[in-house]
């Protein structure tokens, strides 16, 4: 319609609420039907947008350092698995790692962070980070972006990689209610 290279049109940034896809008739005419309103044309933001999102949602520096460490570890695993033929997107996983704790200071932060990313127009990333605190039943046996982010988070204490036992030993004293202790036990078993 505008003479743009169709192979590069997804590089055009759109604000939340923009239209990502317009369907045309077989003869090239516009039907007036569109899909994916409010969805960014790319699955994940670049690193500059990640920083701006972290700024917008007031993510403290110590949490950003943790997110960066999780992102590095998850990305390393994803690159190796991709080479072995697994259907994993290393850059999507790295970016999800950089934003997985965007709502860390809120209750039920994994779901709150997923809501933020959906609102910002990144529903695929939202689906990945909403499970970084606990996977859905049976999901822990697969190798997906969701399971890799979950495990990388469980093997990262603050901004350093640790084994799972140490990570859960260190976090256990923070669980002061029966529900928190049960959630901790379930996460440990999934990891």
Per-region residue spans from a language model:
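Acidic, low-complexity terminal tails and accessory targeting/binding regions
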Residues: 3-51
């Amino acid at each position: 319609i505008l003479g743009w290279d169709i192979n590069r049109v997804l590089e055009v940034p759109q604000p939340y609420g923009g239209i990502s896809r317009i369907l045309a008739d077989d003869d090239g005419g516009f039907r007036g039907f569109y899909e994916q309103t409010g969805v960014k044309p790319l699955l994940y933001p670049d690193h500059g947008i990640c920083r701006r999102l972290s700024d917008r949602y007031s993510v403290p520096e110590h949490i950003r350092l943790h997110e960066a460490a999780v992102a590095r570890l998850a990305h390393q695993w994803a690159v190796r698995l991709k080479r072995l033929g697994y259907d994993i997107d290393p850059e999507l996983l790295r970016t999800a790692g950089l934003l997985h704790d965007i709502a860390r200071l809120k209750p039920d932060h994994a779901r709150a962070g997923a809501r933020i990313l959906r609102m910002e127009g990144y529903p695929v990333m939202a689906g990945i980070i909403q499970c970084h605190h606990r996977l859905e039943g049976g999901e822990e046996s697969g190798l997906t972006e969701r399971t890799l982010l979950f495990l990388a988070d469980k093997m990262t204490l603050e901004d350093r990689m640790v084994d799972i036992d140490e990570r859960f030993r260190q976090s256990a004293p923070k669980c002061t209610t029966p529900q928190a202790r049960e959630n901790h036990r379930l996460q440990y078993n999934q990891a």
